[in-house]
Amino acid sequence: MLRRLTANIFDFLLVLIIIFSIISIIPQSKNAENISKELNTYIEKNLFTLKGEERNQAIDLAYSLDRETTYLYVVAALVMIVYFIFIPKYLKGKTLGKYFRKIKLVNEDISEVNYNTLTYRALLNTGLFIIILLPFFVYICNAFWYFNITLILMALQLLFWLISAIILIIKKKSLVDYLTKTKIIEVKR
């Protein structure tokens, strides 16, 4: 279980580094920069203590910034798809974290996982589902609904991770393993 945990931490940190590295070289529009600066004034006040009109203005600014920078969701989604779907398929069930920890993902019958299984796992386990959905919601919802949908989706993802961690501790197999009929095994070199 420790190998799996350290592999997952390594993978998520690496993906975050890749995403932020790519995003940092993409120039922001002037409008996005202005919105970001204005939003930072609210963040400095602590978003969770804002009330009334100030809170609504902060939500509107965050919504406007997300509309202005939806390309960032595309970058994040593409990196996650490559890292959590294509790389494990190419490396026969291993991400870089799993490779270094000498473990790999297989179907319950020990056969190699396919793209459908890897996609399903990535959508459930990495937040990819949310990253794909939010750019659509930002254009079909107003700021209020977008903010609430975002919070609900994030809470559901956190709940999924919590339930999965509890099941993993008790049963030595995570919720996503049960849902995708997969397991993690040690690799002998």
Task: Describe each PLM feature range.
Residues 1-136, 140, 150-189:
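Short, small/hydrophobic-residue-rich motifs at membrane-helix boundaries and re-entrant hairpins
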Residues 142-146:
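Membrane-helix boundary connector in multi-pass membrane proteins
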